[in-house]
Amino acid sequence: MSGHSKWSTIKHKKGAADAKRGKVFTKIIKEIMVAARMGGGAIDANPRLRAAVLAAKAENMPKENIERAIKKGTGELEGVAYEEMNYEGYGPGGVAVLVDIMTDNRNRAASDIRHIFSRNGGNLGEAGCVAWMFSKKGSIVFNKDKVSEDELMEIALDAGADDVKDEDDQFEVITSLEEFVNVRAAFDARELAYEVAEITMVPQTTVRVEDEKLAQQLLRLMDGLEDSDDVQNAYANFDIPDEILDRIA
């Protein structure tokens, strides 16, 4: 399969663990603060903020935490001023890696990301070296054993989805940024349970990784990036076969 949707499912399951819940909350709070700072605190008038609040609710974040983060973003409450950056590079096997950073210390973030890449067989590249390989899309992932393909296709296409991909044990619904909220709402209205629903960077091409040791090193790189306090999201264009991914993830 394409790898990124499978990795998203694995990543979200890991993020649901109690040990990492605090880190997940922290990343969402930072996104809410920045979204409110950039586009205002009115959820209905700020698509980025609306998406961040929906993500917070999906993680069962308390309402007061969400409201406090919005107020910190708009300046009603004192809060940290985060800076957004992107890093690009290559992982083991020539896999393209794109990293979204949100930090209050640019130098610390740069040093940390460089160290994570080098420690796990990767290297940072110049700005623009891999970003062109990805497109920002909505992604909604379903387990095949929990949905009817016919019903899924009908809802997705009627709601304005771009594509439905059949990937081994999963279906992945791809949407434009503009239609993501509408498509997800259509699935919610019909009570179709999805594994992941997110705005992500979808790779236009993928790199097949069939060597298990190389795949392990690649996932260690991705885990290291996701665990960094300054990293909001990390994307890669790997294509690891399910049988290998299930063994090592």
From Swiss-Prot:
Intracellular or extracellular location(s): Cytoplasm
Record Pfam families: TACO1_YebC_N, Transcrip_reg
Record keywords, A-Z: Cytoplasm, DNA-binding, Transcription, Transcription regulation
GO CC terms of this entry: cytosol
SUPFAM superfamilies hit by this protein: YebC-like (SSF75625)
Gene3D superfamilies noted in UniProt: 1.10.10.200, 3.30.70.980
Main location: cytoplasm
Domain of life, source organism: Bacteria
Keyword Transcription regulation: yes
GO molecular function: DNA binding
GO biological process: regulation of DNA-templated transcription
Protein family (similarity comment): Belongs to the TACO1 family.
Identification of the protein by name: Probable transcriptional regulatory protein Sfum_0996
Organism classification: Bacteria, Pseudomonadati, Thermodesulfobacteriota, Syntrophobacteria, Syntrophobacterales
